[in-house]
């Protein structure tokens, strides 16, 4: 005779047991703590999203925008605060989205682990789908800002689109798609994207045209920005090698990585010394940050890589700001094209 199922009961055919409907919820509550994300307040969630962006690295975006705007002001006498703000938000959005893409693909490929600097997904601070959605939002925000810049600026659409989408593609393809980072081309992508390209973008939207000389002025800043990435890749050399990826630091080894880091660190100071000697003494302002550079060199030499990328980013920010101030304070006509 068929068994009668009481209301609120489920029959477990395999086990031959009867389970109350409420038992399922009870079982979920009995899951191991590590398998369930703890309940967090909205403030904690917002903090998690902000930390996932790696805000300490944003100097690599802000200083090129400031430099390009300063070059526009000194060469053409134009500086629209609306364009400056829109450009800064657009570049920061693309940079932040690129960091999230990096987090997602490094986790997907098994590169990030419990000892990694970025443990956003490893420690389940955010879920992969959260990172993807946030990245899409930031790329969308960047495109909205680019449209806003086109509305305000006299720069041709094709020129604005070429620079902006060139930077956007670089930020995504660094680890997404082709994954330039994994085939030792990431340094080149970052050197171009967060150096000449970002400076040119900020300059062009202000003056409404392209020029070559902003690319030249971007060189010291680009070298300093590359030092951030190289210190990061040198720190992660062993874990990257175990994961089967190839970075420039892995290709050249520890000794040449140390030499390259010093070159990226100190070559900008040589450039500033030449400019201060032959053009304007105001370009000596960035030399005030040289004690920080020597401190970073000692830290790299002793292989104390903890927080080295963050400290290098701090130097990059101060170096860039003093560089911008030096250009603004230089007498008219003392610098080439300014």
Swiss-Prot record:
Q: Which InterPro entries match?
A: UbiA_prenyltransferase (IPR000537), UbiA_sf (IPR044878), UBIAD1 (IPR026046)
Chain positions with N-acetylalanine modification = 2
Top-level taxon in the UniProt lineage: Eukaryota
GO terms for molecular function, please? antioxidant activity; prenyltransferase activity
- What pathway annotation does it carry? Quinol/quinone metabolism; menaquinone biosynthesis; Cofactor biosynthesis; ubiquinone biosynthesis
Is the keyword Hydrolase in the record? no
Segments spanning the bilayer are 83-103, 134-154, 160-180, 188-208, 209-229, 245-267, 277-297, 315-335
Q: Which residues form a coiled coil?
A: none
Similarity comment text for this entry = Belongs to the UbiA prenyltransferase family.
Q: What quaternary structure, including any partners, is listed in this protein's UniProt entry?
A: Interacts with HMGCR and SOAT1.
Its annotated function is as follows: Prenyltransferase that mediates the formation of menaquinone-4 (MK-4) and coenzyme Q10. MK-4 is a vitamin K2 isoform required for endothelial cell development. Mediates the conversion of phylloquinone (PK) into MK-4, probably by cleaving the side chain of phylloquinone (PK) to release 2-methyl-1,4-naphthoquinone (menadione; K3) and then prenylating it with geranylgeranyl pyrophosphate (GGPP) to form MK-4.
* Name of the protein this chain belongs to: UbiA prenyltransferase domain-containing protein 1
Q: Which organism is it from?
A: Rattus norvegicus
Q: Which gene encodes it?
A: Ubiad1
């Amino acid at each position: 005779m068929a068994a009668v199922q009481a209301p609120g009961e489920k029959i477990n055919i395999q086990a031959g047991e009867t389970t109350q409907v409420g038992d399922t919820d009870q079982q979920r509550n009995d899951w191991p703590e590590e398998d369930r994300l703890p309940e967090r307040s909205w403030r904690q969630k917002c903090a998690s999203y902000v930390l996932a962006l790696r805000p300490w690295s944003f100097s690599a975006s802000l200083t090129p925008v400031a430099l390009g705007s300063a070059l526009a002001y000194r060469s053409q006498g134009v500086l629209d605060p609306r364009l400056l703000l829109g450009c800064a938000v657009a570049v920061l959005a693309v940079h932040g989205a690129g960091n999230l893409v990096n987090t997602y693909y490094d986790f997907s490929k098994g590169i990030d682990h419990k000892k990694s600097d970025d443990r956003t997904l490893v420690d389940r601070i955010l879920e992969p789908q959260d990172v993807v959605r946030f990245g899409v939002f930031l790329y969308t925000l960047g495109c909205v800002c680019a449209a806003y810049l086109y509305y305000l600026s006299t720069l041709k659409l094709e020129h604005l689109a070429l620079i902006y989408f060139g930077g956007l593609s670089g930020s995504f393809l660094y680890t997404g798609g082709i994954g330039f980072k994994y085939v030792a081309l990431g340094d080149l992508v970052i050197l171009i994207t967060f150096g000449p390209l970002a400076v040119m973008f900020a300059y062009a939207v202000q003056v409404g045209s392209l020029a070559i000389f902003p690319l030249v002025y971007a060189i010291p800043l680009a070298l300093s920005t590359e030092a951030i990435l190289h210190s990061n890749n040198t720190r992660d050399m062993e874990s990257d090698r175990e994961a089967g990826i190839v970075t420039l630091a892995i290709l050249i080894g520890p000794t040449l990585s140390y030499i390259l880091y010093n070159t990226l660190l100190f070559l900008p100071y040589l450039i500033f010394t030449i400019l201060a000697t032959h053009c304007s003494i105001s370009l000596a302002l960035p030399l005030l940050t040289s004690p920080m550079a020597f401190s970073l060199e000692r830290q790299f030499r002793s292989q104390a890589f903890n927080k080295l990328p963050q400290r290098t980013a701090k130097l990059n920010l101060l170096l860039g700001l003093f560089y911008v101030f030096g250009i603004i304070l230089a007498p008219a006509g003392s610098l080439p094209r300014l």
